[in-house]
Amino acid sequence: MSKLFLTSYLAGTKNLVKEFLKDVPEKEITFVPTASNPEDYKGYVDEAKQAFLKLGFSINILDISKTEKQKIENILKDTKILYVSGGNTFYLLQELKRKKILDTIKDKISNGMLYIGESAGAIITSKNIEYNQIMDNKDIAPDLDNYEAMNITDFYILPHNNEFPFVESTKETIKIYGNKLNLLPISNSEAVFVNGKDFVVKNDDK
């Protein structure tokens, strides 16, 4: 059964990620920062690293864009917990498709691998990421010829709802796609716990 933790901002939901991982014997996380590659600001990546380290986990960095497909497959084969960072969603999907490992990740999740997705890493669990073009610049991914993603969740997560500097872009996304898609807006202090087809949104009470 698929188990996912989807958040806008991992550092803002540290108590919730602790709850998600509380009974997990595995202490190594495969950490994918790829979505942040084209971004100027990457502070959230370091914050996520520190959050996991403070919880007692070790981190194995895997940049999809800079790693050969076979090595990625070998690493994922032994991965029990996969974290995918925030950044540009279109670039992330482009690189996952370039290495042809989207289905590998889906299969691993369906077979029990825990998945933690932050912002872009959460968005790619939906069926299609085109709705995020208001928040993210899709021109950064010129080789991406379609926006079909993992199709694990029945909803379309909208991170950073009403959070600076995304107030206008989240409002505009809801205005344009709110009646077309099952949008699930979450703030930077909220996370979605997914268990199979069931899910619950929780707020980090700090």
Where are the model-predicted features located?
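Class I SAM-dependent methyltransferase SAM-binding "motif I" and its flanking Rossmann-like core
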Residues: 42, 102, 106-163
